[in-house]
Amino acid sequence: MRPWPEKLRQVLRHLAAARYYLPVELKPGQFPESEAQYQQFLHHTEFALALEELEGLGDENTGHAEEELFWSELALAAECMGLAEHSTRYWEKIKGLPK
């Protein structure tokens, strides 16, 4: 097994946590294969692509109790990957959530 740098492990933890905060039963949405695609990207360490799949799942599955936690974890993952535009977009989504 290859050693994983701490930064990659941290990104993986944030992405996994983000998925955890989505509903267990996802709405089928426009792209029903998104969750399987997300998992495939994780296993191939294509974390930026996994992040984008999760973003799509988050956009399709709104209004759940843990939505703020989902976007927070996604923002933290984006920050770890140096994706400032993504991170800013996710923090803005949190600001727009109903309180």
Segments (PLM) and residue ranges:
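C-terminal-biased regions
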Residues: 1-99
